Amino acid sequence: MRTHYCGHLNKSLAGQTVELCGWVNRRRDLGGLIFIDMRDREGIVQVVVDPDMADAYAVASQLRNEFCIKLTGEVRTRPESQVNKEMATGEVEILAKGLEIINRSDVLPLDFNQKNSEEQRLKYRYLDLRRPEMSDRIKLRAKASSFVRRFLDDNGFLDIETPVLTKATPEGARDYLVPSRVHKGSFYALPQSPQLFKQLLMMSGFDRYYQIVKCFRDEDLRADRQPEFTQIDIETSFMTSDQVRAVTEKMVREMWLELLNVDLGEFPVMPFSEAIRRFGSDKPDLRNPLELVDVADLVKDVDFKVFSGPANDEKGRVAVIRVPGGAELTRKQIDEYTGFVNIYGAKGLAWMKVNDRAAGMEGIQSPVAKFLSEDVINGILERTQAESGDIILFGADKANIVAEALGALRLKLGKDLGLTKEGTWAPLWVVDFPMFEEDDEGNLHAMHHPFTSPLGLTAEELKANPAPAVSNAYDMVLNGYEVGGGSVRIHNAEMQAAVFDILGIDADEQKLKFGFLLDALKFGTPPHAGLAFGLDRLVMLLCGTENIRDVIAFPKTTAAACLMTDAPSVANPAALEELAIAVTVAKEKSAE
């Protein structure tokens, strides 16, 4: 039906007759001539309809926005004075010779010329995707997927599919369950990841595997999460963690170079402990210059329990953030930041303004200065390298609360005060994660997943002292987002059973849930390691947006609902009966 896309037309085609198909982006009547901005997925071109072309003019007079049309016309160069430098096709226009209405359009429930609510955009997603901004994002996603396949194919990886209907395994989130009609009372689980299957593929000898795959997690959502998401899943045999990081870093660097013409440079490597100590996060945004500085040793003897208490607690921490120019913050702003850290469990936010460093104590303004000696204050100023005009913000509590609260505050301050270098890229690898994390009851849980190998320990050594164990795991972080995570896997049945034991999974449960894996580990399993990227998150960063819904064609809301199709919906009673399922919905208590 067409010979060209609208957005591909240029001066080299001048004088040629082209056939275009697309939509009316805008129509204007000017002095007898009708101008149409015609749009398709590749862009917009201006069409001129002259009254001398009577048939085309009659059709053009009927056009309204979003009519679907077909056009036959001649490409001509615009006069220099009429070139539109804002359009990729701005040097040319099409003189209409034939015009056909393929389909008319009702008045749209969306206004493409102003901001629509996200609810409306999701309800009429098929219309929202017509907007050039959205179309460009989906096209960039397609290019990213194509690049990944090409890169991994060229590096000897095999694209192998794994099951979607599988067995529930503990991976940190709730499973989406699918009832079996044949095996009544039994359920499949939709995979949270292909983790075990890709490990089994290594045991099968396939050596290098990848898959761009849908995964499902029934968890509380946020801007960068969806109940169904797409993973670039990778697994290798006979490769070290350094080698896995090298090939996947190369993939991301080449992707950014090809799609954005940006050289990310070599990724620095940072241990987990350093990331938490300096930035309060295991996914630090290195575009932000603010850092956490520990001062517990300076305040452990002060007569101020808010500081000395955590400073003398082995699980406590006292740290500060020096904010350049922060002395200009008003009391109201400081109170707002105090309320912000309260969200993360902090009880307050002590502060110290350095109005004049040269003036000594007289140049210090702080509600806690009276509790601190001049030596302590000078020690804090020296350690933070504070200058006149700065403010120092304190966190004093359990170490995890200080890290989380000040880590979040660091990001907020960076954004609010313009300290974060927008428009730049700051990748890194975070490595050497703790193998386990402890809950409030003292129980250990796998920080990543229970198939991650410990670093430099035998099964006996791990069982003897599991709490301080470090895992052979690694995360790729870009601008404060974890875009990929992986590890060296356990390839020994004894070690895998030891990890299950530590996690409180007894022998019977091990056999029930993971018997197939433990059996497979007995048959010459090769050492293997892998990594999975979140494709949605990678594309979100490529597109410069902050919400993965912007880069998914048909996303769900934060309530895991599809506003367009009204999914999820109530099932047909006959279908439920065939599945031997009875649905009970708890009734809300009526107000008394």
Curated annotation (Swiss-Prot):
Binding site for ATP: 217-219, 226, 482, 534-537
MF-aspect GO terms: aspartate-tRNA ligase activity; ATP binding; nucleic acid binding
Its EC number(s): 6.1.1.12
A GO cellular-component term linked to this record: cytoplasm
Residue ranges of the region described as Aspartate: 195-198
Listed Pfam families: GAD, tRNA-synt_2, tRNA_anti-codon
InterPro entries: Aa-tRNA-synt_II (IPR004364), aa-tRNA-synth_II (IPR006195), aa-tRNA-synth_II/BPL/LPL (IPR045864), Asp-tRNA-ligase_1 (IPR004524), Asp-tRNA-ligase_1_N (IPR047089), Asp/Asn-tRNA-synth_IIb (IPR002312), AspRS_core (IPR047090), GAD-like_sf (IPR004115)
Keywords carried by this UniProt record: Aminoacyl-tRNA synthetase, ATP-binding, Cytoplasm, Ligase, Nucleotide-binding, Protein biosynthesis
Catalytic activity, as annotated: tRNA(Asp) + L-aspartate + ATP = L-aspartyl-tRNA(Asp) + AMP + diphosphate
Binding site for L-aspartate: 171, 217, 448, 489
Signal in keyword set: no
Coiled-coil region list: none
Subcellular location: Cytoplasm
Function: Catalyzes the attachment of L-aspartate to tRNA(Asp) in a two-step reaction: L-aspartate is first activated by ATP to form Asp-AMP and then transferred to the acceptor end of tRNA(Asp).
Family: Belongs to the class-II aminoacyl-tRNA synthetase family. Type 1 subfamily.
Subunit structure: Homodimer.
Entry protein name: Aspartate--tRNA ligase
Organism: Vibrio vulnificus (strain YJ016)
